């Protein structure tokens, strides 16, 4: 079973922080941004300062963080996944279909050359896939431990996303797509 959010936040915290800080800086005025539920994307919300963008998220915590900053934020509908606080399911996907995102920021449980970007939950995969399809650019926030890992359900191919990571030790990924390595 998937680790709960408290457990995930403590895993590779420094790396996630670097990735989140970099990702937040890519948000520009007039962007329409989807922020996925998850630990690294939630950290990203803490670093976002752009007032002139519109934010949509399926994560309760990210929505609260953004709203407290006075930013324009929409929370999708959907079923609440207790372990992660993510909103999923048909209602969430229907909300996403109404938006034309300039940027989507997604978390992942695994990245593999053959299987692409994966997650253990089919409903979350559907949400991620829809957000990616509705976005001009899709960023996947992914620390080094997620590479060469495959979870049950694929939501995107590597070539269709930009990966932001703390460290890339397998050069095959850089041949498949844009990979931004961030460090201190």
Model-derived regions: residue spans:
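Residues at secondary-structure transition points
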Residues: 3, 7-14, 18, 39, ...
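Phosphate-binding glycine-rich loops and adjacent basic patches that engage nucleotide phosphates
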Residues: 4-7, 22-28, 52-60, 87-95, ...
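HTH-adjacent hinge/linker in prokaryotic transcriptional regulators
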Residues: 1-37, 45, 49-54, 66-71
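Serine/threonine-rich low-complexity intrinsically disordered regions
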Residues: 12, 28, 58, 167-170
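Conserved phosphate- and dinucleotide-binding cores of soluble alpha/beta proteins
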Residues: 61-184
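Glycine-rich SAM-binding Motif I of class I
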Residues: 42
């Amino acid at each position: 079973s998937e680790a709960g959010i408290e457990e995930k936040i403590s895993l590779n915290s420094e790396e996630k922080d670097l990735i989140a800080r970099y990702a937040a800086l890519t948000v520009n005025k007039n962007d329409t941004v989807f922020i996925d539920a998850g630990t690294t994307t939630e950290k990203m919300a803490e670093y976002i300062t752009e007032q002139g963008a519109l934010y949509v998220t399926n994560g309760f915590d990210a929505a609260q963080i953004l709203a407290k900053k006075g930013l324009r934020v929409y929370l999708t509908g959907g079923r609440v996944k207790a372990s992660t606080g993510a909103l999923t399911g048909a209602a969430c996907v229907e909300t996403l279909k109404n938006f034309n995102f300039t940027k989507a920021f997604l978390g992942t449980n695994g990245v593999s050359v053959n299987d692409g970007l994966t997650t253990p939950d089919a409903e979350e995969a559907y949400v991620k896939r829809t957000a990616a399809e509705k976005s001009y650019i899709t960023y996947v926030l992914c620390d080094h431990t997620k590479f060469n890992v495959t979870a049950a359900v694929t939501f995107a191919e590597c070539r269709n996303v930009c990966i932001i990571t703390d460290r890339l030790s397998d050069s095959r990924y850089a041949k498949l797509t844009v990979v931004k390595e961030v460090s201190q």
